[in-house]
Amino acid sequence: MVQLGVSPFAVWRNQSDTKLGDTEGSDTKAGQRCYDDLYSDVVNWMQNGWLDYVAPELYFHVGFEVVDYEKILAWWQTNSYGTTLYISHAIYKVNRQPKYAAWSDPSEISRQLDLARSIPEVKGLVFFSSKWLIQNELGVTDLLRDYFFYEPSELPPLSILGNRTPFRDDRLDKN
C-alpha cells in the first residue's frame, strides 16, 4: 500500500494577515506560512481529496505567543477536511531551545501528546527526528516508551483501504 501525504509547516495562513483578505487562517502570527511563503496550498489539496494523510509540523510549545501549539492543533482539527491527520512533534527541540523554558521541561512533550490524543481526528503522532529519539534528551524517549507507547499502537482504519485496518507486523520490538 502506498499513501500520498505531506508534512507541511504548521501555519497555512495567519488570520491576522487581514490585508490578504483571508479569514480562514489560524489565530497565529507566524513569519512563514505555507500558502503565502512556501506556495503550498495544503488546504486546497485536502479539500479536493488529493492527499491520503497530512502530518503538519506543530513544532511550537504550548502557550507560545506567535504560534501556540494548542491553537494550531485545534485549527488543523477543524481544517483537515476528512484527510487522515497525524501530528508531527519537535523532539529535536527538547533541551535545545534555551530561549524558551518550555523545551527544557520534558513534560512539554507530554502536554502536547495529551492534547493531540484528546482529539478524535488525530490518528497518529510523528516525531522529528529519530536522531533525537536515540539521544534521549532529558529522558524524553523513556517518557514516550513508558507513558505513551507502552503497548503496541492501534492502527487506524484507512479510507484508502475501504476503512479497513492495515496489516500490523508484530515482529517489531519497541525497544
Please identify what each model-predicted range represents.
Residues 1-38, 83-94:
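Aromatic-lined carbohydrate-recognition surfaces of secreted/lumenal glycan-active proteins
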Residues 39-65, 80-171:
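Substrate-binding cleft of secreted/luminal carbohydrate-active enzymes
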Residues 65-73:
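Active-site-adjacent beta->alpha loops and helix N-cap segments on the catalytic face
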Residues 74-78:
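Short, surface-exposed basic-aromatic patches at helix termini and helix-loop junctions that form
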Residues 174-175:
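C-terminal accessory/binding modules appended to enzymatic or scaffolding proteins
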